[in-house]
Amino acid sequence: MSDECLIAKIVYLSLQQKEVTQQMIADELKMSQQSVSRKLKELEERNLVRRSLSKEGEIIRVTENGEKLLEDCLSMMRATIISSHVLEIRGRATSGLGEGRIFLSMPYYMESFKKFLGFEPYPGTLNLVIYDRISLENRLVLDISKAINIPEHKEENRVLGAVRAFPASVNDLKPAAVVFPLRSVHPKSVIEVISPYHLRKELNIKDGDEVVIQAYA
């Protein structure tokens, strides 16, 4: 495991727990404590982590140098993403619960998509389930890519959550966009696509059909 991945795992655990112990890291990585201890010692010698003893065991904290290493790694990933521009995601069409229709019936979102994406979407989303590893990796890359951001909007008695969007094509049809509402209940393996077209009708898409998305990041 690379130093960056181990540091990222420690940071991830620290977001869930007040203190991260060596045992927690070993359990999370399914590695022996001896192997984890050797790796942590190397990181400590490079001033990337600090180790201290407590009644819970050995506590691990990431240093400023460790955080900087992680930030540099993330910057390189972003640079790679920017240079690639297009991310292909394949998925199979699936019926949603009607949430997309409700979401797109709200004037704020309709007006915002028209303003930021240049089109007024059909009142409904095309939901796709990602089924292959490369497509899922590309989907996850979008999480750290620069998106078109629809800001959160406060109304009198409710708050409409922010949305991240990426211009896209659907089976080569444009315009369209992949959208990620920040309050979505969907897992990472499900994406929502909007377009001014009724995509199922326009492209004759049925549940289970493979759909190819080209997302522009």
Curated annotation (Swiss-Prot):
Top EC class of this enzyme: transferase
Example GO BP: riboflavin biosynthetic process
Binding site residues for CDP: G96, L97, G98, E99, G100, R101, Y197, H198, L199, R200
GO MF terms, alphabetically ordered: DNA-binding transcription factor activity; magnesium ion binding; nucleotide binding; riboflavin kinase activity
Keyword field contains Flavoprotein: yes
Pfam family name, one: MarR_2
Cofactor(s), by name: Mg(2+)
Record's catalysed reaction(s): riboflavin + CTP = CDP + FMN + H(+)
H-T-H motif-like: annotated span: 1-86
Binding site for Mg(2+): T125, N127
Riboflavin kinase, as annotated region: 87-217
EC number: 2.7.1.161
Sites where the protein binds FMN: S184, E192
UniProt keywords, alphabetically: Flavoprotein, FMN, Kinase, Magnesium, Metal-binding, Nucleotide-binding, Transferase
Pathway it works in: Cofactor biosynthesis; FMN biosynthesis; FMN from riboflavin (CTP route): step 1/1
Purpose: Catalyzes the CTP-dependent phosphorylation of riboflavin (vitamin B2) to form flavin mononucleotide (FMN).
PANTHER family: RIBOFLAVIN KINASE
Family: Belongs to the archaeal riboflavin kinase family.
Protein name: Riboflavin kinase
Annotated organism of origin: Metallosphaera sedula (strain ATCC 51363 / DSM 5348 / JCM 9185 / NBRC 15509 / TH2)
